[in-house]
Amino acid sequence: MTIFVISDSAGETASKLAAASMAQYPTVDFTLIRRTFVKDEDKLVQALEDAKKAEAMVLHTIINDHLVAIANQFFNEHQLFHFDILTPPVAEIERLTGVAPMREPGALHHLNENYFKRIEAMEFAVKYDDGKDPRGFLEADVLLLGVSRTSKTPLSLFLANKNLKVANLPLIPEAHLPKQLFEMDPKKIVGLTNDPNVLNGIRKERMRAYGLPENTSYSDIEKIRRELAFANDLYQKLGCIVIDVASLSIEETASMILNALNLEDHSYYSTETSED
C-alpha cells in the first residue's frame, strides 16, 4: 500500500501521522512518499497525479484555501481517498474563537523558534539571578535593580516567559557595585522601589515563615529606609526608570516595564511539543 504525504512545508506532521497509522499494521507492506513545500498549483497537481498513478492514500497538510479547493476537486473527480489534517481543526478553532488563521505555511516552525527563545530566556534569568554573574548584564534586555523583597526574581522569570533576557541585582548599601552596571544603557535598567512600611511587613512575614523572630536588622524600618534611600540615589545617578511596586502585582509591574522600555511581548505561543 502506498501513502502519499503532501505538505506546503516540511511535511513532518503528516509524516508522523502516517507513521503512527502504519505502525498498527506490521504485516502490511507500506510505501511512504513525501511531496513537500508544495506551495503552488502546478506542484500540487503534479503531486496529486503521482498519487493517483500509485493508487495511494493521501495525507496532506495544506493551509492555503485555494490549493485545498483544488485538491478536494481532484480527490472527488478521481475518487482518491484523502485525509485533510489541518482544515477541520483550523476551521473549528476559527469558529469557536472568531479569530481568522494566518494561513501561513510552516507557521509552526516560527512558533517553535519562539518557544526555544523562551527557554533560552528562562535559562538566562536563572543564570543571572540575584547578581550571580554581572558579566551577563551587558547581554540582558532588561536589568532589574532593587533592595531585598522588591520582586526582582519573580519579575525576571515572568519577563523571561515573554522571551526577554532579564538579569537582576540586589542592592545592598555595603556591597560593591559591579562595573558592568555603569557600562549598561540606562534605558535597559529598571529600578524597583517600595514603601518602607510595606517592605517592613513583607520582611517580617518572611522571618516568620523561616521560624525566626520578626524583629531583626533585616526588617528594621530605619534600615529599610536607608536601603531605599541608597537605591533611589543610585537610580538617580544612573538615570534609569523607577517603578514603585508597593501596590502592584507582578503582572502589573511587568506590563509597566514593557511599556516603559518599549519592549514587545513575544509570548504569543506556548507549547510543550515541537512538530512541523
From Swiss-Prot:
The keyword ATP-binding does not apply. It catalyses: N(tele)-phospho-L-histidyl/L-threonyl-[pyruvate, phosphate dikinase] + ADP = N(tele)-phospho-L-histidyl/O-phospho-L-threonyl-[pyruvate, phosphate dikinase] + AMP + H(+); N(tele)-phospho-L-histidyl/O-phospho-L-threonyl-[pyruvate, phosphate dikinase] + phosphate + H(+) = N(tele)-phospho-L-histidyl/L-threonyl-[pyruvate, phosphate dikinase] + diphosphate. Its EC number is 2.7.11.32, 2.7.4.27. Keywords: Kinase, Nucleotide-binding, Serine/threonine-protein kinase, Transferase. ADP binds at G146, V147, S148, R149, T150, S151, K152, T153. It comes from the Bacteria. One of its GO terms (molecular function) is phosphotransferase activity, phosphate group as acceptor. Bifunctional serine/threonine kinase and phosphorylase involved in the regulation of the pyruvate, phosphate dikinase (PPDK) by catalyzing its phosphorylation/dephosphorylation. Belongs to the pyruvate, phosphate/water dikinase regulatory protein family. PDRP subfamily. This is Putative pyruvate, phosphate dikinase regulatory protein 2.
